[in-house]
Amino acid sequence: MALSKDDVLNAIAEMSVMDIVELISAMEEKFGVTAAVAAAPAAAGPAAAAAEEKDEFDVVLASFGEKKVGVIKAVREATGLGLKEAKDLVESAPASIKEGVNKAEAEELKKKLEEAGATVELK
């Protein structure tokens, strides 16, 4: 019996965030593709030559330092993950905490995580 699209979507909806990340990685590996968003074509002319200020950032946890429990709490607060998912994410450092966030949110999250004892990078 073949699964319908609705069956697959319902199964994915019941998965945890970490399970979905693992599923995406497995699909990328199996089919030889990436889940990256295609970049929009660049505008031509001298205006395009001007350096653009980056407006979206990825908040990456480089390490959790000495205060792992505090970092896990900060990650849970920022992402809404459950305790186990947040712990697994922190322990898998370097790991992306949030992707495609604006500069203000990225800076605020970086500050909170660093106050909790983590080493954080903005990319």
Swiss-Prot record:
Transmembrane segments: none annotated. The keyword 4Fe-4S does not apply. Gene3D superfamilies: 3.30.1390.10, Single helix bin. SUPFAM superfamilies: ClpS-like, Ribosomal protein L7/12, oligomerisation (N-terminal) domain. Keywords: Ribonucleoprotein, Ribosomal protein. Forms part of the ribosomal stalk which helps the ribosome interact with GTP-bound translation factors. Is thus essential for accurate translation. This is Large ribosomal subunit protein bL12. It comes from Psychrobacter arcticus (strain DSM 17307 / VKM B-2377 / 273-4).
